[in-house]
Structures are given as structure tokens and as C-alpha cells.
Amino acid sequence: MKPMTSDVMPAAERKVRVDLAERSYDILIGPGLIAAAGGEIASRLKGRKMAVITDENVAPRYLEPLMASLAGSGMDPVSLILPAGEKTKSFEHLIPVCEAVLGARIERNDAVIALGGGVIGDLTGFAAGIVRRGSRFIQIPTSLLAQVDSSVGGKTGINSPHGKNLIGVFHQPDLVLADTAALDTLSPREFRAGYAEVVKYGLIDKPDFFEWLEQNWQAVFAGGPARIEAIAVSCQAKADVVAADERENGLRALLNLGHTFGHALEAATGYDSKRLVHGEGVAIGMVLAHEFSARMNIASPDDARRVEMHLKTVGLPTRMADIPGMLPPADRLLEAIAQDKKVKGGKFTFILTRGIGQSFIADDVPSSEVLSFLEERIPR
């Protein structure tokens, strides 16, 4: 794999810069960043009032050290603890978050802090984006998925019965603190789910990185330098795409590899994390995207098999049959896909591939082909 372009910092930390002119920000990666958060924030923001939003799973481990770090740096923090899980990304919980931010009297130089995984980051970022027409926002992601994907790039939002992430705004954070020590407390399933997003970056346009993951995934799972390297490469990859296409007018859509199928499967399971979590849906979706590309004679079936083999080796689901319980029929899944992506003249936009690391945007995929493909793969 080619060397990373992100800066090397003391104590095995990495720094990745998201270049968005006056809205540029740093992603700091390494152990101990939650305890050091107060100093990092104080060096960047003038405000002293902080509203910390977290969930009931993360709070017992990390809320107290974060609050102590903020207070120790002269800040006045308040906190709100929400239920954990995908169903928290809803209007029901958005309103209390907004009220908590207003109640904390957060002003222009103060900040809202998301302490948790992707759900907390997306929800909190949305609240920060709409309260006072935009408040400063800091991401402290505690899951692998959030560290390499959802905390970077400014996409925020909540789910709807019509589909995932359909209500939201673009609102960039002022800082991302990815404390890699927090990943040591994740369940194996949570870590694997986040790893699917790491693999995605190799499959989009970094075949050398995918090959490196095939050879080094065990070291990534074990922790240490390989894990930090994988996170830093992933963050740099996303930062480069976001800098080139912040509002997803073109290139950024490539980051949706596996997500069109994956989001439809999440909706089909009612966002029930016992059946399917986001990263698992992405894993299945990436295999489906490669298989569909092969079906359309765009890619080799060998590439789809290689992707499936790696994801299966690390313990991720790769087939719709791996999802517990019944799935709806193909036409219902197609309806969910239609909500997730724009349909023009009966044709879908998908991220397809010509091979490992050769993904591209296809905006003329016939819905009839997708329906036929799904009918073949839904377990009977």
C-alpha cells in the first residue's frame, strides 16, 4: 500500500485535514483523545459553553472523563443522555436535543459535542445545524464506523418511515477527535460493522488498500499501528472526496458504494439492530453491487467472489440469507431503493464497479434489471 499523506503527530497520533476553505477542520486520530478533548477544543474555539449529547451505552464509559476534561480547560459543559440504537435517529429525539442546546444557551462561539457512534453524530449534527440556524459542532466518534465515515463530511440527519437519512442538512464539524482507545470496548459485531466502511474505501478507488486489508485485517482487529493506519487512510480518502464535492453533486456519490442496497435492507428490517446494523447492510450491499455489476457484464464475477470472501472471512454477513427473519418481496425492496436514490424515467442511480477499486456512478440502471436481480437473490 502506498504511504499515507496525512500528517504524523506525536504519540502515534495522525492528523487529517478536511480542506473546505474557511470551513476546513482537523481529524485527530489516536488513543487518549477523549481525556485530552478540553485542551484540543480550547485551542480552536473561543466559547466556553458546551452541550454534550451522548447515549446510554457510551455515557457510563466516556461521559465523565470528557466532562472533566472540558471543565479542566475552563469550559462549562452540560450533557444529555439518549437511548442507544438506530431508532434514536428520529423527530422524537431531535426535539429534546434542540431544547437541550437552547437550554444550555449555546452561542456562536460555543459548541455542541456529539459523543458516540453514528446515530448520535448524525442526530446531534442535525440539531446543531438547525439550532440558531447553525451552531458550532464537534464530533467525538466512539465506534469504528463513525470514526472512518459518518463523523467526517458534514452529512447529518434522521430517519423516516420512508427511508434512512431522508431528513437532514449538510453541517460540517469544527473538529473530529477519533479516540482509537474507545474502539477497544466495542463488541466484535460493532467493530466488524465499522470495518465494512473501511473496506469500502479500498473498493471505491484504492485497490492497493484493499489488498493491504486482505493481508493485514487481523492486525487491524487486534489494534495498534495497523488499526490507526487503516483509520487514517479511510479518513484521508473521505476527506479528499468531501473537499472535491462537499454537497454530493458528483464524485461524493461514490461513497454510497453498497449503501443503496444496504439502506433498503435496513428499512426492510425496520432498523432492528438485532437483525441488521448499518455496517452489515453495507457489507451485503457491496457484495450485491459487485454481483450486479458482473450481471450487467461490467465486471468480472471473480471480483465479486473476492469481495465476498474477504468480508466473510472477517465475520460479516454477505448474503440476504444471512439476515435473520423474513424479508419482504423484491418489489418492496425496489420501493425502498426508489426512496433512497433518485429515479428518472424508471431508471436508478447506483454505484457500480468495473473491478476492485474501479467504482463509478451509473445513472441509467433500468429498474427492471434491479427487480430481476433482487428476485434471484432474496431467500425463499
Curated annotation (Swiss-Prot):
<keyword id="KW-0028">Amino-acid biosynthesis</keyword>
<comment type="pathway">
    <text>Metabolic intermediate biosynthesis; chorismate biosynthesis; chorismate from D-erythrose 4-phosphate and phosphoenolpyruvate: step 2/7.</text>
</comment>
<keyword id="KW-0862">Zinc</keyword>
<dbReference type="GO" id="GO:0005737">
    <property type="term" value="C:cytoplasm"/>
</dbReference>
<dbReference type="InterPro" id="IPR030960">
    <property type="entry name" value="DHQS/DOIS_N"/>
</dbReference>
<feature type="binding site">
    <location>
        <position position="259"/>
    </location>
    <ligand>
        <name>Zn(2+)</name>
    </ligand>
</feature>
<dbReference type="InterPro" id="IPR056179">
    <property type="entry name" value="DHQS_C"/>
</dbReference>
<dbReference type="GO" id="GO:0003856">
    <property type="term" value="F:3-dehydroquinate synthase activity"/>
</dbReference>
<comment type="function">
    <text>Catalyzes the conversion of 3-deoxy-D-arabino-heptulosonate 7-phosphate (DAHP) to dehydroquinate (DHQ).</text>
</comment>
<dbReference type="InterPro" id="IPR016037">
    <property type="entry name" value="DHQ_synth_AroB"/>
</dbReference>
<feature type="binding site">
    <location>
        <position position="155"/>
    </location>
    <ligand>
        <name>NAD(+)</name>
    </ligand>
</feature>
<keyword id="KW-0963">Cytoplasm</keyword>
<keyword id="KW-0520">NAD</keyword>
<keyword id="KW-0456">Lyase</keyword>
<feature type="binding site">
    <location>
        <begin position="142"/>
        <end position="143"/>
    </location>
    <ligand>
        <name>NAD(+)</name>
    </ligand>
</feature>
<feature type="binding site">
    <location>
        <position position="164"/>
    </location>
    <ligand>
        <name>NAD(+)</name>
    </ligand>
</feature>
<protein>
    <recommendedName>
        <fullName>3-dehydroquinate synthase</fullName>
        <ecNumber>4.2.3.4</ecNumber>
    </recommendedName>
</protein>
<dbReference type="InterPro" id="IPR050071">
    <property type="entry name" value="Dehydroquinate_synthase"/>
</dbReference>
<dbReference type="Pfam" id="PF24621">
    <property type="entry name" value="DHQS_C"/>
</dbReference>
<dbReference type="GO" id="GO:0000166">
    <property type="term" value="F:nucleotide binding"/>
</dbReference>
<dbReference type="GO" id="GO:0046872">
    <property type="term" value="F:metal ion binding"/>
</dbReference>
<dbReference type="GO" id="GO:0009423">
    <property type="term" value="P:chorismate biosynthetic process"/>
</dbReference>
<keyword id="KW-0479">Metal-binding</keyword>
<dbReference type="InterPro" id="IPR030963">
    <property type="entry name" value="DHQ_synth_fam"/>
</dbReference>
<feature type="binding site">
    <location>
        <position position="197"/>
    </location>
    <ligand>
        <name>Zn(2+)</name>
    </ligand>
</feature>
<keyword id="KW-0547">Nucleotide-binding</keyword>
<dbReference type="GO" id="GO:0008652">
    <property type="term" value="P:amino acid biosynthetic process"/>
</dbReference>
<feature type="binding site">
    <location>
        <position position="278"/>
    </location>
    <ligand>
        <name>Zn(2+)</name>
    </ligand>
</feature>
<dbReference type="Pfam" id="PF01761">
    <property type="entry name" value="DHQ_synthase"/>
</dbReference>
<keyword id="KW-0170">Cobalt</keyword>
<comment type="similarity">
    <text>Belongs to the sugar phosphate cyclases superfamily. Dehydroquinate synthase family.</text>
</comment>
<keyword id="KW-0057">Aromatic amino acid biosynthesis</keyword>
<dbReference type="GO" id="GO:0009073">
    <property type="term" value="P:aromatic amino acid family biosynthetic process"/>
</dbReference>
<feature type="binding site">
    <location>
        <begin position="118"/>
        <end position="122"/>
    </location>
    <ligand>
        <name>NAD(+)</name>
    </ligand>
</feature>
